[in-house]
Swiss-Prot record:
This is 1-deoxy-D-xylulose-5-phosphate synthase. Mg(2+) binds at D159, N188. The lineage of its organism: Bacteria, Pseudomonadati, Pseudomonadota, Gammaproteobacteria, Pseudomonadales. The gene is dxs. It is an enzyme of class 2 (transferase). It holds the Pfam family Transketolase_C. Its cofactor is Mg(2+); thiamine diphosphate. Gene3D superfamilies: 3.40.50.920, 3.40.50.970. One of its GO terms (molecular function) is thiamine pyrophosphate binding. Coiled coil: none annotated. The keyword Chaperone does not apply. PROSITE patterns: TRANSKETOLASE_2 (PS00802). Keywords: Isoprene biosynthesis, Magnesium, Metal-binding, Thiamine biosynthesis, Thiamine pyrophosphate, Transferase.
Length: 630
């Protein structure tokens, strides 16, 4: 069984077996008796590596043995291995030729936080969002069959990701096309109890063996000729298996279900995977693991050790203590508690983001009004719509990138019916080290085109609270988008009063250039404005746009500059240009925002600089345009 470590090593560990097995080809040259020692070395290497860089932590520790077994048994990369979400893929990266580059994890031009097809041939499908693996692996299995290939397709999905409807859509489809594929459920939520002990592991070996499979198929052919006999035999088999395994649902869908087995028992994993490798049709293996396995603190607190920051050197001077500004999510968390206290109609909904969206306090103070729907964004939005129909006031706390998954519901179920639902959209704009799959680059574009939707962009913590008030008290759908991280430490007013919808605020009066700011770039815009003597307008609303303020700015300035941390295409700046065109106002307009590309992972400041959205980039772009217009 795995060794349990108590500390993260600060020096690179000695790993003689891992040194020989940093690719699957090297791994497969090891003897089976060496693999448990290799697992200890890989776990220690992961502890050291993530300790140096920070990153996702607990999930990878929990799949050390499974990762080794998969690459040992299957002929990767020819056999297609698809990881769901990707939080657990660091051991996979270490074993597939990227060990030497793990020191660059989540850094600019370094190893990505999630599997990327462009990074390695072993990363067969790019991920970041959950519940896509079964559909992707099924598509690969079908395409391989059409091409006459015998390669295997394997999807590894967690119990959390399996709660999403998309996963069940794929589970329902695969048996219809008799796909030759394997789905592995990495169940790290349930404990390893008696039914995952020796008897269950023994049963798994039997049920997955060629002998059992051929006997089962042979018996089916024979018994099918006898009226009623095969049905009796089938029910007897299901009853016997049902006493030991919880696979009835998957069997009913048409999958050959095996398990649950201990995901930290390498011999059992290897034997079971070998047996299942050549079985035809859709196969389902239920593996039970422990998140954070092998690192004592993470086993005790898997949520706290989901991800960690890098270790500071032992001899580093202590950082001076300072009172930091609250995170935008914390401002939201305080606001929803305050508004819930004032209005008993308020209900809070989140798709498995209680901690990230800062809903812990709300869930504890108002448990009967808090709803975590798991990874089910579509359901979250329509659930809110149903609640709104009955007079509740739903607040959907959701990351920008994940709201994309509930877009049809946002339009069809909320907006068309003009229902009172407030979307508190966290992680808007660039999010840093998690990269393009988690960036909130498109919400202004896909929200402002929806009739009746009020779309707001607070410029600091106090504005966030004001605009949350405004959206909540508005009749109809509304959205407030705010970024990851902290703001400029603005003084936060404690009231619950709204602002006038569709009205911006002039923050600095200047001449020549007017910078129309949609969001938290206000601070940088003010810095630039001091140098250029420019006017700065905090627009607040993308929709409805303050057309009177835009008209006034156009009449009194030579150049209008729109500034947003959203895709330029279809974003807030586009709304300004569309209005000017409708009003037949001819004016030079410079749109500053995210380019028509995916911005790769780096520190947020690096990403903003790359896009020209820091103070230096904003100033340079304005001066360049001024030079062109003379």
């Amino acid at each position: 069984m795995p060794t349990t470590f108590k500390e993260i090593p600060r020096e690179r560990p000695v790993t003689p077996l891992l040194d020989r097995a940093d690719t699957p080809h090297g791994l497969r040259r090891l003897g089976e008796a060496e693999l448990e020692t290799l697992a200890d070395e890989l776990r220690l290497e992961l502890l050291y590596s993530v300790g140096q860089t920070g990153g996702h932590f607990g999930a990878g520790l929990g799949v050390i043995e499974l990762t080794i077994a998969l690459h040992y048994v299957f002929d990767t990369p020819d056999d297609r291995l698809v990881w769901d979400v990707g939080h657990q893929a660091y051991p996979h990266k270490i074993l597939t030729g990227r060990r030497a580059r793990m020191s660059t994890l989540r850094q600019k031009d370094g190893v990505a936080a999630f599997p990327r097809r462009s990074e390695s041939e072993y990363d067969t499908f790019g991920v970041g969002h959950s519940s896509t693996s079964i559909s992707a692996a099924l598509g690969m299995a079908i395409a391989s069959r059409l091409q006459g290939s015998e390669r295997k397709s394997i999807a590894v999905i967690g119990d959390g990701a399996l709660t999403a409807g998309m996963a069940f859509e794929a589970l329902n489809h695969a048996p219809e096309v008799a796909a030759n594929m394997l789905v592995i459920l990495n169940d790290n939520d349930m404990s390893i109890s008696r039914n995952v002990g020796g008897l269950s592991n023994y049963l798994a070996k039997i049920l997955s063996s060629r002998t059992y499979s051929s006997m089962r198929e042979g018996s089916k052919k024979v018994l099918s000729r006898l009226p009623g006999a095969w049905e009796i035999a089938r029910r007897t088999e299901e009853y016997a298996k049902g006493m030991l395994v919880p696979g009835t649902l998957f069997e009913e869908l048409g999958w050959n279900y095996i398990g649950p087995i201990d995901g930290h028992d390498l011999p059992t994993l290897i034997a079971t995977l070998r047996n299942m490798r050549d079985l035809k049709g859709p196969q389902f293996l239920h593996v039970v693991t422990k998140k954070g396995k092998g690192f004592a603190p993470a086993e005790v607190d898997p949520i706290g050790y989901h991800a960690i920051t890098k270790l500071e050197p032992l001899n580093a001077p202590a950082a001076p203590k300072k009172i930091s500004a609250p995170k935008y999510s914390a401002v939201f968390g305080q606001w929803i508690c305050d508004m819930a206290e004032a209005d008993s109609r308020l209900v809070g909904i989140t798709p498995a983001m209680k901690e990230g969206s800062d809903l812990v306090a709300f869930s504890e103070r108002f448990p009967e009004r808090y709803f975590d729907v798991a990874i089910a964004e579509q359901h979250a939005v329509t659930l809110a719509a149903g609640m709104a129909c009955e007079g509740s006031k739903p607040v959907v706390a959701i990351y920008s990138t994940f709201l994309q998954r509930g877009y049809d519901q946002l339009v069809h179920d909320v907006a068309v019916q003009n229902l009172d639902v407030l979307f508190a959209i966290d992680r808007a704009g660039l999010v840093g080290e998690d990269g393009p799959t988690h960036a909130g680059s498109f919400d202004l574009s896909y929200l402002r085109c929806i009739p009746g939707m009020v779309v707001m962009t607070p410029s600091d913590e106090n504005e966030l609270r004001k605009l949350l008030n405004t959206g909540y008290l508005h009749t109809g759908p509304a959205a407030v988008r705010y970024p990851r991280g902290t703001g400029p430490d603005a003084l936060i007013e404690t009231g619950l009063d709204p602002v006038e919808i569709g009205k911006g605020v002039v923050r600095r009066q200047g001449q020549g250039v007017a910078i129309l700011v949609f969001g938290v770039q206000l601070a940088d815009a003010l810095v630039v404005a001091e140098k250029l003597d420019a006017t700065v307008i905090d627009m607040r609303f993308v929709k409805p746009l303050d057309e009177a303020l835009v008209s006034e700015a156009a009449a009194n300035h030579e150049l209008l500059v729109t500034l947003e941390e959203n895709a330029v295409m279809g974003g807030a700046g586009a709304a300004v240009s569309e209005f000017l065109a409708r009003a037949n106002i001819l004016k030079s307009v410079l749109h500053l925002g995210l380019p028509d590309t995916y911005v790769e992972h780096a520190k947020p400041a690096q990403m903003l600089a790359e896009c020209g959205l820091d103070a230096q980039g904003i100033e340079a772009a304005i001066n360049e345009r001024l030079a062109l217009i003379g």
